[in-house]
């Protein structure tokens, strides 16, 4: 009879009922899958009684497995196998058939294939499971291809025993309805009618479902080649195909798969989660099975590797490379066996998480199990290798951040310089408070080149600090200076100006008096009054000339005399004090050598023909110039104070400013005190006759062509500042040296006159 390449197996667990007369039947075992052509095992002969029921137990040794190339049963366990036999009692008569029922999982015959002889089989048939009920009726199960003579289609049949004639096994590969054969009204109805439906709904064991899942995976991959749902779909096929086989046993496998795929597409994701979880468990089983196989190989040694299937497991299964890929995302949950066998333990990752310098315990294991390691084992230490230490750049960056947060510097912690350089930490080097930033230095140079900026900076520099800084022997007491600056912070602007004015007058006049032999201008009212009396009693020769030539004009200016005296004193005090502070050679070196920007005096009496009183001019012009200068002088008392306080803050720029020259030269053109002392001389009724020393000086002053020589000698208290301003701003050094002896002689005479 025709067969599709797989045969039922009768193992040693066949149960027979003893009797007087025995029947003989022959069965063919299932052929195990092999890469080459299958070798057909020999036939097995069993003796059964002729009248009793024949019940064959389940196959305990080798379960039914799927055949190669989609042929053979794809379910685990045995199914309904119908065996025909004849008894040997009596003469030859129509055969008396008995049915043997084997009860286990349903047998699913797969896609069509070829016979051993090359003849195509009909489409497969899905058979339902049947309970183990003994069949006693003489039911004959036959087929259209059955014959009494033996196996058809070229299958060799060994010679039967002389007293028995074996009927062929009916192949379940016929998808057509079971026809009514020559042996009666046979069909599947008797066996299905006596089956209990409750037994068919019993849940199968997990192991059987796992084997079915392994067999369904190739079918699922064929329909979903590149989908991650292959394992879940294989789990979905287990109950669906089982239900379809119960509902319609004549349905082919292709039809069942098509309906199962349609059901899978209409299933929601929530309902699919059950099959995903089942697939996860099956993948874990597969991984554990593979690890057990590898463990058994390691125990036997790498020299003699056993066959890939263990003795207790089914030989037919997925290849090893397929299973190796599965444990990557589904690790085993069966205790400590899995990490030691295949999966890497999580312990080698702990050194990277906690401390890098701790050696991982993993490298010690290859030495202990060196003889049992598989070939891919030596590559795993390289995969789980972790860095032994943290990079020094990261450590140094962390140290820098912590030092910056804590406010400490590398030098404070005692860290050597070499370690800081090794950590590649560059810090700006500062020497004496000067940064080496080229951009900052260029910006400072640019600011210093601006005259307005320099002027503003000079205005805020403390004079004491500047004096000590520019002195040849700087001995500055920074503590005293800081205390003084703190005291000055609480003063108002007027108090601050007055304090600096008094200090500058004391220091400046103290330095100018021993050099030029002049009377010191103190802040005490007695000395200041004595200086004023000396100036009033000894008028200048030019003042006498102006008084004699134009008494009405000078008398007319008499009410303004007192104001002019105050203004002249205020204008003369500041330059005298500040010019006295210019004696140090450092200040002269700092003083710019450029010529004065504006020699035009603020008062019209300076530098004009009327004010200078050149020979040949009428007295009216002189008096007119005096009157004009005195009228403008009344408008300046407030401005002189402001300008004087401004110039106290920048003493070395007096030669460029027009204010000192306006303060030193009177508006009347007669010298610094010419316009100031002429009204006071008229008030007090001074004698118009000049002293002999003054008369002797009269001609050279009027005869010299330069304006500096036309200026008369000032009074005793202001003559030093007048000479210095003329020597710096208007005349050369030779002219100041030429007149140096004459003022000293006149001062001595005036001092003697005051003492008398």
Swiss-Prot record:
Instruction: Enumerate composition-biased segments (Pro residues).
Output: 304-321
The region called Disordered is annotated at: 173-200, 293-438, 511-639, 653-756
Enumerate composition-biased segments (Low complexity).
654-665
Q: Which domain of life is it from?
A: Eukaryota
Ranges of Basic residues compositional bias? 746-756
Q: Which InterPro entries match?
A: NUT (IPR024310), NUT_N (IPR024309)
Bias (Polar residues) occurs at: 543-560
Give residue spans, biased composition: Basic and acidic residues: 417-427
Family classification: Belongs to the NUT family.
Task: Give the protein's recorded name.
Answer: NUT family member 2F
Q: Per the UniProt entry, what species is this protein from, by scientific name?
A: Homo sapiens (Human)
């Amino acid at each position: 009879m025709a067969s599709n390449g797989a045969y039922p197996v009768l193992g040693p667990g066949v149960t027979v009922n003893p009797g007087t007369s025995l029947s003989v039947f022959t069965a063919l075992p299932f052929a195990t899958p092999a890469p080459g052509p299958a070798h057909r095992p020999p036939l097995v002969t069993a003796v059964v009684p002729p009248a009793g029921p024949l019940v064959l137990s389940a196959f305990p040794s080798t379960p039914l497995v799927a055949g190669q190339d989609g042929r053979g049963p794809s379910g685990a366990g045995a199914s309904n196998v119908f065996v025909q036999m004849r008894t040997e009692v009596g003469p030859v008569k129509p055969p008396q058939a008995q049915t043997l029922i084997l009860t286990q999982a349903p047998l699913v015959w797969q896609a069509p294939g070829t016979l051993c002889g090359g003849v195509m089989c009909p489409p497969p048939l899905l058979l339902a499971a049947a309970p183990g009920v003994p069949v006693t009726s003489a039911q004959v199960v036959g087929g259209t291809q059955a014959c009494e003579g033996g196996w058809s289609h070229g299958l060799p049949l060994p010679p039967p025993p002389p007293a028995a004639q074996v009927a062929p096994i009916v192949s379940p590969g016929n998808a057509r309805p079971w026809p009514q054969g020559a042996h009666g009204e046979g069909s599947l109805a008797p066996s299905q009618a006596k089956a209990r439906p409750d037994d068919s709904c019993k849940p199968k064991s997990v192991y059987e479902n796992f084997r079915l899942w392994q067999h369904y995976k190739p079918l699922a991959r064929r329909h979903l080649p590149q989908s991650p749902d292959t394992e879940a779909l294989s789990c979905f096929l287990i109950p669906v195909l089982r239900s379809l086989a119960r509902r319609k046993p004549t349905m082919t496998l292709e039809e069942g798969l098509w309906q199962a795929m349609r059901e899978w597409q209409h299933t929601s994701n929530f309902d699919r989660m059950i099959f995903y979880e089942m697939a996860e468990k099956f993948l874990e089983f597969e991984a554990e099975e593979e690890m057990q196989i590898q463990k058994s190989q390691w125990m036997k040694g790498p020299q003699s590797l056993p066959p890939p299937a263990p003795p207790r497991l089914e030989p037919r299964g997925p290849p090893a490379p397929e299973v190796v890929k599965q444990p990557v995302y589904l690790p085993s949950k069966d205790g400590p066996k899995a990490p030691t066998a295949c999966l890497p333990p999580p312990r080698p990752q702990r050194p990277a998480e906690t401390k890098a310098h701790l050696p991982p315990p993993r490298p010690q294991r290859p030495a202990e199990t060196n003889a049992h390691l598989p070939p891919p084992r030596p590559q795993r230490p390289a995969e789980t290798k972790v860095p032994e230490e943290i990079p020094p750049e990261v450590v140094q960056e962390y140290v820098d951040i912590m030092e910056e947060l804590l406010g400490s510097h590398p030098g404070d912690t005692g860290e050597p310089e070499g370690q800081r350089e090794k950590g590649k930490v560059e810090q700006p080097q500062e020497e004496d408070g000067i940064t080496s930033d080229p951009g900052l230095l260029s910006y400072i140079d640019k600011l210093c080149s601006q005259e307005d900026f320099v002027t503003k900076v000079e205005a805020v520099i403390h004079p004491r600090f500047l004096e000590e800084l520019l002195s040849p022997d700087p001995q500055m007491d920074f503590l005293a200076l800081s205390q003084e600056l703190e005291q000055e912070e609480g003063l108002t602007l007027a108090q601050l100006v007055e304090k600096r004015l008094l200090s500058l007058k004391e220091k400046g006049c103290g330095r100018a008096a021993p050099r030029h032999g002049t009377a010191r201008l103190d802040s005490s009212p007695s000395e200041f009054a004595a200086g004023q009396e000396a100036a009033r009693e000894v008028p200048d020769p030019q003042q006498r000339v102006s008084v004699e030539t134009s008494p009405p004009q000078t008398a007319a200016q008499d009410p303004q005399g007192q104001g002019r005296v105050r203004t002249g004193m205020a204008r003369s005090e500041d330059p005298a004090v500040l010019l006295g502070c210019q004696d140090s050679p450092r200040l002269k070196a700092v003083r710019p050598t450029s010529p004065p920007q504006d020699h035009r005096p603020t008062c019209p009496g300076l530098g004009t023909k009327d004010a200078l009183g050149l020979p040949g001019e009428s007295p009216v012009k002189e008096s007119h110039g005096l009157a004009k200068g005195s009228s403008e002088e009344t408008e300046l008392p407030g401005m002189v104070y402001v300008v004087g306080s401004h110039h106290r803050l920048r003493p070395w720029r007096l030669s460029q400013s027009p204010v000192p020259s306006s303060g030193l030269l009177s508006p009347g053109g007669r010298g610094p005190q010419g316009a100031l002392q002429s009204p006071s001389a008229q008030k007090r009724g001074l004698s118009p006759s000049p002293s002999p020393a003054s008369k002797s000086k009269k001609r050279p002053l009027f005869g010299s062509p330069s304006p500096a020589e036309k200026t008369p000698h000032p009074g005793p208290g202001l003559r030093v500042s007048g000479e210095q301003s003329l020597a710096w701003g208007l005349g050369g050094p030779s002219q100041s040296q030429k007149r140096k002896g004459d003022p000293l002689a006149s001062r001595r005479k005036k001092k003697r006159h005051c003492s008398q």
